[in-house]
Amino acid sequence: MTEFWLISAPGEKTCQQTWEKLHAATSKNNNLAVTSKFNIPDLKVGTLDVLVGLSDELAKLDAFVEGVVKKVAQYMADVLEDSKDKVQENLLANGVDLVTYITRFQWDMAKYPIKQSLKNISEIIAKGVTQIDNDLKSRASAYNNLKGNLQNLERKNAGSLLTRSLAEIVKKDDFVLDSEYLVTLLVVVPKLNHNDWIKQYETLAEMVVPRSSNVLSEDQDSYLCNVTLFRKAVDDFRHKARENKFIVRDFQYNEEEMKADKEEMNRLSTDKKKQFGPLVRWLKVNFSEAFIAWIHVKALRVFVESVLRYGLPVNFQAMLLQPNKKTLKKLREVLHELYKHLDSSAAAIIDAPMDIPGLNLSQQEYYPYVYYKIDCNLLEFK
């Protein structure tokens, strides 16, 4: 994905001239950036006091909405299990890819009517995105619980014969059932010791039924064998078996329990499949909603900051730059030359040092022109 710089500068004789000047400066210098106009409608200005307060509120709203956008995108990646191409296909805004949406940005008059005050518009955005955030938490929690329960059951049916569930491996015929005196045990026998098992199992304790052991299953290291003996000899048999590196598994053949476990696994698997489609659709729709809201917050911030810096009547041009990554420093210098006259205190600053104690982010990124970054790198793939 990519990064944009959203900037504004005061209109020269016309706003078109401001735009042409920037475009010429960035294109003649080895194409430092792809530039386009960023269209912001005539919003209601309100009073200076309101604008100053709103400037701080919008900074917080910007960070909050960006956080929600990233959370929805990241959860989409989790649900699609990090299939990167598949995730990018679903991260759209208004049905188009994010770069297209930003570069062709048009204010959504229906969602955010410009007859409303700036504060009202920001509150509409905050309310909508808070709802998305809350819905995401509850949907993610429900889906994660389902997925976690299914994974726990699947984990039981995986792994070595020493730890995995044996219910899927054994059959009723492998056991002596409903006997008052006899019981069948399941024993994990290392492959290296299998010959010892055959020679010894009948004598590990008294009252072992001769020739009652068969191999029921195997994995890389071990065989699973059954053996039938008298109930009262079980403790002695377990003890002697352990001494000879044969491990008796705790297992009782119970058809009802095994059937219930299988049904539970099928139910969870079916529920997960049922929820997957609607969840991905919800994430897709609400990612779009949140991303659109985020770019509108950026537009509001540019508008408010431009009025505060450049004064009334409203006369500025908002412009979008997609910088060439190799020439970021050069682009900063060109912008500095173009706009340093706007603020004498910033005339000596191109990039504020990052390590001045007490310097907050807004000061770090202070330039003589209005500047906000839009970073579309929304995902962290594991």
Curated annotation (Swiss-Prot):
The keyword Membrane belongs to this UniProt entry's keyword annotation: yes
The family this protein is said to belong to: Belongs to the V-ATPase C subunit family.
Protein's UniProt name: V-type proton ATPase subunit C 1
InterPro entries in UniProt: ATPase_V1-cplx_csu, Vac_ATP_synth_c_sf
Stretch forming the signal peptide: none
Record PTM N-acetylthreonine, positions in chain: T2
Reported tissue expression: Ubiquitous.
Gene that encodes it: ATP6V1C1
Keywords (A to Z) from UniProt: Acetylation, Cytoplasmic vesicle, Hydrogen ion transport, Ion transport, Membrane, Synapse, Transport
A GO CC term attached to the entry: extracellular exosome
Entry keyword Membrane: yes
